[in-house]
Amino acid sequence: ANYNVPDGSYSTDPYQPATRVKEFKQMVQALHRAGIRVIMDMVYNHTFNTVESNFERTVPGYFYRQKEDGTLANGSGCGNETASERPMMRKFMIESVLYWIKEYHIDGFRFDLMGVHDIETMNEIRKAVNKVDPTICIYGEGWAADTPQYPADSLAMKGNVSHMPGIAVFSDELRDGLCGPVWKKEKGAFLAGVPGAEMSVKFGIVGAIEHPQVRCDSVNYSQKPWAEQPTQMISYVSCHDGLCLVDRLKASMPGATPEQLVRLDKLAQTVVFTSQGIPFIYAGEEVMRDKQGVGNSYKSPDAVNAIDWRRKTTNGDVFMYYKRLIDLRKSHPAFRMGDAEKVRKHLEFLPVEGQNLIAFRLKDHANGDSWEDIIVAFNSRMTPARLEVPVGKYTVVCKDGVIDVRGLGTQIG
């Protein structure tokens, strides 16, 4: 593996080394012109080959962690794990990230199995990046595939993210609170109308921070808040690992009609985009991407992995809903306060009767929002629900899978 060169198979001529570099830069430039920032997936935690790797051939035994018996540690689940805590591996990672920023103008980095790396290295990367551009995004998977050969309290795991300011991790609490356990695809949760996941969803709504109305003893994977700030949590329901959203809904609700799948798809992403963390969408979800039930599709053909863009027409309603969700979040800072104290002050969960119903209020022009009070309610029941809200006249902007900021009518509280 060469971490500092684009892969040639994506270029128009893989046999001309300069072509991949030029075309990658042209791609980044074109995306920037379109107002899109570019985030790279960085897999420093392991290499495909150990003995023949550049690391091992440079200094044998140095760049990889070993067990006490001398065999390779395997926290990555891929045969080895790199030793990020060792000075030269740490130096390599920092300089590699800076190279991609300065040479290719990359805007962010997603660290694969970040839990294999040590906290100090991740913090040093954040500090080095801040000197160039503090707006560059750094986030990763706050877990490992197996147990790394390094003290758990020193690893960049989800539970240690409070020690990594400016670094975010994925929230599997919110994901599985909505969709069900990732390893039990037939088992649903909030979206499927299964009671008991409400607190896990609330945990995600506030951005995994401490909040007086979130009881962590009822949250699926975390018994305490792990984020100091809501910007340290990635809100999502699906990514390239595991089933895409449509396949997950079909697996947990095999009797669902196409119309129900559309409504649940919209409901899921509405939770994501009105939560205080950083929203994340898997490519193609906006057109209801379907991978034919294949979860781990890294070795599947294009017939499974390709995005069928004809779905943009057949599922145009869903596409426009996603677009309007994004516009809604961008237009209203109440949904992205970015500060834990503001969230605790302005986000208030409303009392509801029964389960499979969650409602909250963003009050008092939260984060300088033009709207004084915003009421958000999620109902995954098969029937309408009654909700008591503070006295007032409210303009409805999102209802029954339709968004229109001009208003869909009014309600009196």
Language model features by range: what are they?
Residues 28, 97-101, 126, 130, ...:
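Non-transmembrane alpha-helical segments in soluble domains
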Residues 3, 31, 41, 100, ...:
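Conserved, mostly hydrophobic/aromatic
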Residues 261-262, 273-281, 285-413:
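Carbohydrate-interacting/catalytic domains
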Residues 84, 110-113, 223, 249-262, ...:
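Active-site rim elements
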Residues 1, 42-51, 113-118, 141-145, ...:
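Short, solvent-exposed turn/loop segments enriched in Gly/Ser/Thr/Pro and often Arg
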Residues 126-127, 135-288, 298, 364-369, ...:
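Conserved alpha/beta catalytic core and glycan-binding cleft of carbohydrate-active enzymes
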Residues 19-26, 35-38, 88, 92-95, ...:
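Generic recognition of stable, solvent-exposed alpha-helical segments in well-folded globular domains
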Residues 1-104, 117-133, 137, 149:
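Substrate-binding/active-site clefts of carbohydrate-active enzymes
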